[in-house]
């Protein structure tokens, strides 16, 4: 069987909501790592790229009408290189890698770029058309995150719990305490801060160069969402606004962020022809559905499914990158999979609670981080897994090359 390999990857820093990257359109943001991949790999013939596949969860504003194609052109790739945008909400970036890997395994391509982008700062307000003449029922939605234009049957049959409310549901179901969640969040901040100060995160990042109207140039080099001075006392003091006697706070949840990532996926033969060095083999990927109100547990069945496909167990994984949408759901996943809350090989360099969660980009970031960490640890297998809004999970296994 033909195999698909991650040969290189890069990402932008992750910006805070309204922060350093908020002035950058999503298509321009996605073009940055695409362009950098060509710079980093001068022997790569861009004419040989079969497709560019990017995940993006919003697509309601400047990221509309196939942002992958827009970014491909803006990055200076040949017009002959096609691009497509996929949407599996939070799992979009990881799903993009899966699409690329399947294309190679099926013989439908040899060289692809896959990744994701999200500019949550620039997500627009949207309003639907009137359903009748002179209607006064117009409703406006903030597209940054959450439900919009809800189907009444969906609301009736499955509810429309917000993302924090789904985390509350998981915490209540599995009896995950506020104390355990805050401790998990603190570890995320501490591990991320250590990874940033040691230069580990910098290995993944291409700086973003910005110029203001006065011509002043600023270079954004580092992720800006993390709070390295966070203490347990500070986390304990935050209010839980989503439910009476709730446990979900701004401190034990991921952020609303901006960022983009791109990875080169190639067959073994094409990698050799293009002077690329395979770093990780994409072994298998799986998705699974769960009850929408418990969407945070989606990684559990997805992980079990991908492990079965690969003929492996959770204990074969040397690195696990689990997206931290909320501490409650991350802990729920760990406990359901039989892993300790503070497993050192799970998010060893922190996670989304500290780094942030630009929806369409996050899955690609997980795969990039996992491929780097496998080489640092001389490990063999890595698992990347995420929960997905409306009740899904996605999981991918990588093998170090």
Swiss-Prot record:
Keywords per UniProt = Acyltransferase, Transferase
Q: Which Enzyme Commission numbers does its entry carry?
A: 2.3.1.174
Please verify whether the record's keywords include Acyltransferase.
yes
Per UniProt, the enzyme's principal EC class comes to transferase
Q: Please list the reactions this protein catalyses.
A: succinyl-CoA + acetyl-CoA = 3-oxoadipyl-CoA + CoA
Cystine pairings recorded for this chain = none
What is the active site of this protein? 90 (acyl-thioester intermediate), 357 (proton acceptor), 387 (proton acceptor)
Query: Which Gene3D superfamilies does this entry report, sorted A to Z?
Result: 3.40.47.10
Q: Which InterPro entries match?
A: PcaF, Thiolase, Thiolase-like, Thiolase_acyl_enz_int_AS, Thiolase_AS, Thiolase_C, Thiolase_CS, Thiolase_N
Q: Which domain of life is it from?
A: Bacteria
Please give the biological process terms from Gene Ontology that the record holds: 3,4-dihydroxybenzoate catabolic process; phenylacetate catabolic process
One GO term in the molecular function aspect is:
3-oxoadipyl-CoA thiolase activity
Q: Does the keyword Transferase apply?
A: yes
Pathway note: Aromatic compound metabolism; phenylacetate degradation
Q: Which Pfam families match?
A: Thiolase_C, Thiolase_N
PANTHER family documented for this protein: ACETYL-COA C-ACYLTRANSFERASE, ACYLTRANSFERASE RV0859-RELATED
**What family does this chain come from, according to its entry?**
Belongs to the thiolase-like superfamily. Thiolase family.
Any idea what job this protein has?
Answer: Catalyzes thiolytic cleavage of beta-ketoadipyl-CoA to succinyl-CoA and acetyl-CoA.
What is this protein identified as?
Beta-ketoadipyl-CoA thiolase
Species, as recorded: Escherichia coli
């Amino acid at each position: 069987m033909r195999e698909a390999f991650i040969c290189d990857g890069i990402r932008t820093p992750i910006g805070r909501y309204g922060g350093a990257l908020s002035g950058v359109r999503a298509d321009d943001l996605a073009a940055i790592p695409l362009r950098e991949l060509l710079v980093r790999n001068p022997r790569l013939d861009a004419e040989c790229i079969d497709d560019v596949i990017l995940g993006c969860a919003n697509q309601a504003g400047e990221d509309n009408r196939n942002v992958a194609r827009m970014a491909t052109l803006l990055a200076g790739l040949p017009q002959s290189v096609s691009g497509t945008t996929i949407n599996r909400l939070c799992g979009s970036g990881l799903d993009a890698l899966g699409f690329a890997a399947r294309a190679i395994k099926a013989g439908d391509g040899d060289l692809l770029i896959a990744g994701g982008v999200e500019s949550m700062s620039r997500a627009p307000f949207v309003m639907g058309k009137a359903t009748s003449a002179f209607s006064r029922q117009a409703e406006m939605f903030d597209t940054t995150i959450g439900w919009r234009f809800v189907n009444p049957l969906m609301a009736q049959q499955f509810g429309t719990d917000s993302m924090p409310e789904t985390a509350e549901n998981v915490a209540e179901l599995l009896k995950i305490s506020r104390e355990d969640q805050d401790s998990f969040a603190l570890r995320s901040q501490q591990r991320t801060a250590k990874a940033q100060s040691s230069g580990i995160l910098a290995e993944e990042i291409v700086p973003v160069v910005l110029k203001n109207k006065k011509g002043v140039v600023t270079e954004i080099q580092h992720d800006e969402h993390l709070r390295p001075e966070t203490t347990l006392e500070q986390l304990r003091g935050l209010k839980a606004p989503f439910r009476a006697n709730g446990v979900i706070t701004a401190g034990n949840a991921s952020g609303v962020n901006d960022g983009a990532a791109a990875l080169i996926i190639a067959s073994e033969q094409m990698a050799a022809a293009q002077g690329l060095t395979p770093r990780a083999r994409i072994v298998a990927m799986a998705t699974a559905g769960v009850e929408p109100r418990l969407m945070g547990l989606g990684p559990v069945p997805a992980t079990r499914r991908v492990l079965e496909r690969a003929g492996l167990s959770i204990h074969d994984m040397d690195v696990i990158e689990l997206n931290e949408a909320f501490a409650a759901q991350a802990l729920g996943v760990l406990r359901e999979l039989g892993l300790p809350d503070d497993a050192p090989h799970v998010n060893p360099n922190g996670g989304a609670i500290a780094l942030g969660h630009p929806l369409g980009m996050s899955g690609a970031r997980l795969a990039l981080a996992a491929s780097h960490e496998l080489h640092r640890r001389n490990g063999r297998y890595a698992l990347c897994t995420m929960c997905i809004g409306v009740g899904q999970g996605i999981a991918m296994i990588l093998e170090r090359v």
